C-alpha cells in the first residue's frame, strides 16, 4: 500500500519511506535526503535526492542485474532529476525538464483537484518514462558491440556497414577516428548512408557528401552519382 503522509507514527511503521522522515538508511528502507548534511553525492559532485537513493539501492535489480544499464540510467536520467531536486543546476540543460513536466500533474491554484489522484497519474507517467529509458539504455549498450564489430570488420575504415540499423554515433566516435560514413538498411528495405558528425550533437560532418547531390532525387540523383537505384539525398 502506498501512503502519502508526514504523520510520524505512520512513517515509523512503514517498510519503506521515501522523501520524508529525515533519514537515509538503505538497509532500513529509509530514503530521505532533506536531513542536515544530505545523503551523499556522486563522484561527479551531483548530490543524491530520494530518487537517486532508491535507484542506488534497487537500480541494478530493476535492470535485471545489468549494472551497465543501471549506471547508464543513473547518469542519463536519475542524476539529472536529483540535480534539479537538490538545486544543483550547474550543467543541467535549460528549458522544461522532466521534473517540471511531472510537476504539472499537480492541480493549479485555480483547480479543485484531488492531489492523490493527480499523484497516481504522475506515478503512472513517470513509470512509463523510466521503463522506456531502461529499454533505451539497454538497447544502446547492446548496439555498441554490434557497431564495434562492424568497425573492426570494415573493408574500408572510412565506411562502416551495418547489417541492421543500430544506434552508432557514440560508438563510432569512441572507437574510430577514420570513419566518415555509415551505411545501413532502413525499415523500408532501402539502404541509407549517413555522414559521421565531427562531434556528437554537431551538424558539421567529418566529410560531407558532394554538394552537387544535395536535394536531388530519383533520376537526377542517379545521373550525378552513377547509381541506378539512388533515391534521394
Residue spans for each PLM region:
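Short amphipathic alpha-helical surface micro-motifs
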Residues: 12, 141-143, 174-177
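Arginine residue identity/basic-tract feature
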Residues: 4-6, 30, 36, 42, ...
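Gly/His-enriched, cation/cofactor- and phosphate-binding structural elements
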Residues: 149-233
Amino acid at each position: 500500500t502506498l501512503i502519502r503522509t508526514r504523520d510520524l507514527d505512520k512513517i515509523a511503521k512503514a517498510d519503506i519511506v521515501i522523501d520524508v522522515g529525515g533519514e537515509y538508511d538503505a538497509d532500513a528502507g529509509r530514503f530521505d535526503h532533506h536531513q542536515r548534511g544530505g545523503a551523499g553525492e556522486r563522484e561527479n559532485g551531483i548530490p543524491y535526492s530520494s530518487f537517486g537513493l532508491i535507484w542506488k539501492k534497487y537500480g541494478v535489480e530493476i535492470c535485471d542485474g545489468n549494472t551497465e544499464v543501471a549506471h547508464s540510467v543513473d547518469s542519463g536520467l536519475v542524476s539529472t532529476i536529483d540535480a534539479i531536486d537538490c538545486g544543483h543546476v550547474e550543467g543541467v540543460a535549460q528549458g522544461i525538464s522532466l521534473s517540471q513536466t511531472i510537476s504539472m500533474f499537480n492541480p493549479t491554484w485555480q483547480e479543485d483537484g484531488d492531489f492523490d489522484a493527480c499523484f497516481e497519474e504522475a506515478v503512472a507517467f513517470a513509470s512509463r518514462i523510466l521503463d522506456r529509458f531502461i529499454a533505451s539504455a539497454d538497447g544502446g549498450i547492446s548496439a555498441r558491440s554490434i557497431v564495434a564489430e562492424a568497425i573492426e570488420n570494415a573493408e574500408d575504415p572510412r565506411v562502416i556497414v551495418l547489417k541492421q540499423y543500430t544506434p552508432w554515433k557514440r560508438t563510432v566516435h569512441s572507437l574510430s577516428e577514420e570513419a566518415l560514413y555509415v551505411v545501413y538498411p532502413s525499415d523500408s528495405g532501402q539502404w541509407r548512408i549517413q555522414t559521421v558528425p565531427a562531434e556528437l550533437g554537431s551538424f558539421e560532418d567529418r566529410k560531407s557528401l558532394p554538394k552537387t547531390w544535395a536535394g536531388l532525387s530519383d533520376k537526377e540523383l542517379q545521373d550525378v552519382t552513377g547509381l541506378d537505384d539512388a533515391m534521394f539525398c
